[in-house]
């Protein structure tokens, strides 16, 4: 649990997807996943959900964001999805206005006990209380439905009030720092 094996597996999956669709069009990885859905109605529904988010974020500023694991290491496995939902992935929490903690094997309830001592007051996300805990099973995008749900979660976290899919409290929570 919580080891680098999961990160390597996700990075391998992304490498395979990037190889198939090319580096120039990041959104193609979502399209590739959605195109693999056999049920035409479900495929259309998933595409509509993605299109809704994409349309809204066209008119919004990008949000500097970082995803950390339980050792405060940067997790880059979801960077492509972060970019597609209007995030600007960062490598250092000092540059991120939004901080998300997520790691496979660590549900939100467990993260609640681990995160407080890891936070640094000088981080902008901590200063502005933009810290989120993401359930371990939700921060995955290996299948189309998971990817779209993860995209909706990220949209809610990055743009509170602009996107409301009803996932707060179920798949992620806002962790108040002030």
Predicted features, each with a name:
Residues 1-178:
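N-terminal ligand-binding lobe of clamshell/alpha-beta domains
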């Amino acid at each position: 649990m919580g080891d680098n094996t999961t990160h390597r597996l996700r990075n391998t999956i992304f490498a395979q997807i990037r190889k198939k669709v090319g580096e120039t069009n990041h959104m193609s990885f979502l399209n590739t996943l959605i195109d693999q859905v056999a049920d035409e109605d479900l495929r259309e529904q998933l595409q509509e959900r993605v299109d809704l988010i994409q349309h809204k974020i066209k008119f919004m500023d990008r949000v500097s964001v970082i995803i950390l694991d339980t050792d405060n290491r940067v997790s880059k496995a979801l960077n492509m999805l972060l970019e597609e939902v209007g995030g600007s992935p960062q490598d250092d929490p000092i540059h991120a206005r939004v901080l998300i903690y997520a790691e496979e094997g660590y549900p939100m309830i467990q993260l609640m006990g681990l995160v407080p001592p890891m936070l640094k007051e000088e981080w902008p996300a901590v200063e502005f209380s933009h810290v989120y805990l993401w359930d371990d099973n939700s921060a995955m995008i290996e299948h189309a439905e998971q990817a779209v749900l993860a995209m909706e979660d990220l949209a809610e976290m990055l743009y509170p009030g602009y996107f409301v899919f009803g996932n707060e409290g179920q798949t992620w929570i806002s962790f108040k720092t002030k």
